[in-house]
Amino acid sequence: MRAEVVAMTGENLDMDAIKKAGDILKAGGLVAFPTETVYGLGGNALDPQASMKIYAAKGRPSDNPLIVHIAELEQLEKITTEIPEGARILAEKYWPGPLTMILPKADIVPRETTGGLDSVAVRFPSDRVAQELIKAGGGFVAAPSANTSGRPSPTMAEHVEEDLGDAIDMIIDGGQVGIGLESTIVDFTEDVPVVLRPGYISLEMLQETLGDVRMDKGLLITDSSVHPKAPGMKYRHYAPKADLSIVEGAEEEVVRCINRLTEEAVCKGMKVGVIATDETKERYAHADVLSIGSREEEETIAHHLYEVLRDFDDDRVDVIYSEAFYTPKMGQAIMNRLLKAAGHKIINAQEEKK
């Protein structure tokens, strides 16, 4: 049976639909909903069976932890055993917002939700629809991104319906999300806070607030024997159906390299997609070219990344070449997602031309 789709925004809430969605969560069902980052696939975080349903619907490995979403700061103390001072400072500054913190879990949180770990990842989203749903659903909603595991995360309800329409109970359509990349994840179970996933709240912002904060060295791990402490650390994520490579180097060299690679692929009968910027989109030939935005507007690049990857799926391209996007504030987050989507395939434009 197809999921029921209901439309609403934070400015135009449908409280009857919210109550119905909350009842679905309380009964152990699954509801996809908008947040300020990407769409989430929600289940009752305190119900082990609901968490297992999330893993099954997504085709997600069960050792990949789920983030527990709350809608009231006081709820944090119910699902954790310790809240370090640094975590309290970040919560006061960045919650509600695109920040997830990993803390020691209380017994009330089942291991099915935490991927077998003694820690729990917690977030307080700023989206009003998300907040009202969490309250209606009992206060604790486990929610990874609402997509088939490994695929680009959904930034519109249509993406959710495409991936999970037959596997879940309801989709709340809140329009296109604001940020377009998942939340920053900070681990407070170590001596020094560690960023396990970069996001809108950058390492520099965290260091300005707390002082010593580090970036995890394992952000690029793919070793199957490693147990991930946070969503997205171990498994390939965000990937389009076509083979994706990132071309790095000076702009002129990148354009020449992508055009040459495109020409070679077209000669082999392949359909090519190119992820460009507003500044370069007219310079590519023989390819389906999609601009991800201007290099002067990095938040726009982040906002459009997953949408562009899904658009190329719709266009049925065989191979995708992308420029690199090492922008000042969100470059870490953007390139983290792009590298994972490409399986870390990088082409050096300078070396290619030799």
Residues of each region from the PLM?
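Active-site-adjacent structural elements in enzyme catalytic cores
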Residues: 1-354
